[in-house]
Amino acid sequence: PGSDTAIMGIFGCDPRKYFSGRAPLELAASGGVMPEGGAAYRCNMVNLGGPEGAPFEERIMISHSAGSIEGEESDELVTWLFAQPDFAALAERAQLTVRPGSSFRHLAVQERADIAGIVLAPPHDHLNEKIGPLLPSGCANAEVLLGLMRKAAELLPGHPINKKREAEGKLPANCIWFWAEGKGAALPNFPARFGADGGVISAVPLCHGIARLVGLEPVSVPTATGEWDTDYEAKTAAALDVLAEHDFAAIHLEGPDEATHNHDLEHKIYSVECLSERVAKPLCAALRERGEDFRLLILSDHRTFMANGAHGGTPVPYMIYDSREMGPASGLGYTEKNGESGPFLESGVELMPRLFCL
């Protein structure tokens, strides 16, 4: 289970019908165009551990985000990497270019790419595992991508940014990791289906790509980080700005997920508390002050487990609040346990019609 298919479902797009890969959705966020016959991939900056001098296959996936590397450092590293003669020659033969992105998240676009049968593993689902069984496989093009990853592992450790990160006790971005391949994306129009236009506030390219493809406005907040320390007040204010002119706003918070991938229970709890105290409560209060009726949907796109830092596919609890209904409603608090006794939906695709009372 991934955020790509889950968030598509939340916006009413059945992933079984429309999903063709995560990277094309993120490419749409940047306004990029998929070349005919080409493919896009996520290109993560990652940290690999293991004994010094160990074969590449014996390395360990320590961090899918290179220790939540900052955007400026990450962009500089990936741009430098693709400019190094040995790496650039491999990338040119592969007809592959990079589009620097958000934090550890970059995109690679390949002309005339054959991805039939390719197997690329999501790094966040395999933390602290040996990478040998996770390396690209399944077709000749997988070997091309693997060659680029091997070369990156040779070159990146020596970059001054990584030396500086190590000196500061941070994880270096010592490799790249290709995954989330896809050929193209087209999604049904949200305003036409639900009779409401608006915007999506997020620090994550995936959400902005889905927004653009369904006909909603991607809204960026300069002080949003995509981590537990994001600017919650600014994201709430951005949603209120959208709702001043439109009928729909979505706020995406990545903090709980990233904290869990990093086995950081303290900041996972903190992020959830901030959702309640610094987003939901002030948002509702401001809308009431405006004298507007509204409905509010709160949910996570998927579960992420502290035990292993990986995603889970079991159903998530959701809550719908209607400002016009002042009665007790279900009388249940919003918890995983109470969610088990609430109305069960077979698919996330059913949520948006439920929010709009369709």
Predicted regions, residues:
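Metal-dependent active-site segment of extracytoplasmic phospho-/sulfohydrolases and closely related
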Residues: 271-314
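Anion-binding catalytic surfaces of enzymes that hydrolyze or transfer phosphate/sulfate esters
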Residues: 116, 183-267
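Flexible, glycine/charged-enriched surface loops at secondary-structure junctions
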Residues: 91-99, 159-171, 221, 248-249, ...
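Active-site nucleophile/metal-coordination loop of metallo-enzymes that catalyze phosphate/sulfate
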Residues: 1-83, 310-313, 319-322, 328-358
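A contiguous, mid-domain pocket- or channel-lining segment that forms the substrate-recognition surface
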Residues: 22-159
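Loop-centered beta-sheet repeat module
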Residues: 129-197
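Active-site His/acidic residue clusters
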Residues: 51-63, 110-134, 214, 236-283
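Active-site proximal loops enriched in glycine and acidic residues that flank catalytic Cys/His/Asp
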Residues: 222, 252-255, 264, 276, ...
